[in-house]
Amino acid sequence: RAEILTALSQLHDLGMRHVSVDGGEPLTHKHVDEITAFLVQRQVRVYMNTNGILVPRKLATIRLLSKVKISLDGPAACHDAVRGEGSWRKAVVGALAARDAGVPVELTCVVGRRNVGQIEELLAFADHARFSVVFQPARNSLFVGSARDGGAFQLEAAEVRRVFRRLEAAKLRGCAAVANRWSSLRHFRDFPRDVPPPCAAGFINATLDPEGNLFHCGQLSRLGRSANVVAMGARAAFEGLARHGCSQCWCARVVEENYAWGGRVHRMLPPLGVAEPTLRASRRLK
């Protein structure tokens, strides 16, 4: 506990003002209440990625958050087929509890072969419940360490582009439930691009694991553990991070941050217009 708080204090001294708490399930951590309060007292905005199950029992901590983020793959049958029977209901109960506590709720939908036909149904649900949804494509790296076959779930590149052109068109029509910013929608409707996006990893952000290991990017391999904030101190660990991008990026909020950091203003503005693609019958959005 003391080591965690010391590391966070040192990172705050370096300028840390926004933290996204992930897991596993962060609400099961025995110090999550204290850590969240510690950060908020220092004017740090705290987002939390949770499965929603413990949200109704942790409302005192939930109310401190700037945003609650919950994965939802689609309607109940679609979500439960991937994550287990009853998981949709538990996620939605948690999302509603956070919303009713006054905390903004953002759903994350990983678009793949099993849920591509339910995107518009998910948007209708989110709009009715006053949630927003961030969409991003399924990639193999999302399934590392799990028993699920990422290759069987992800779409072909052309299918990804069609889906995100439809989402971009929906946002242009005023669909408030599409929470992606223009830069990630543009990125994914051209995905994968020949030209890699700018990458802020290791410059203005980093990923810290429970053992104190610091990584320039949480989306890449975490095998290299040469920068530990407990052993080295936060400044030395951060300054020693690798600073190199990758050929692509699939995480919507990271993509948006990267384009903003790189000053790609033309990618951040709404397009003049997007023609909605005609999907094959087997892929038609309901």
Label each region the model flagged.
Residues R1-K58, L279, K286:
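Conserved alpha-helical substructure of the radical SAM core
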Residues D22, S71, A252:
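Conserved residues at the C-terminal ends of beta-strands
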Residues R42-R45, A60, S66-K67, S71-D73, ...:
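Radical SAM enzyme [4Fe-4S]-AdoMet core and its adjacent flexible, acidic
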Residues P56-R57, C78, Y259:
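Glycine/Thr-rich phosphate-binding loops of Rossmann-like dinucleotide-binding domains
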Residues D194-P198, E211-K286:
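Flexible mid-to-C-terminal extensions adjoining Fe-S/redox cofactors in radical SAM and related proteins
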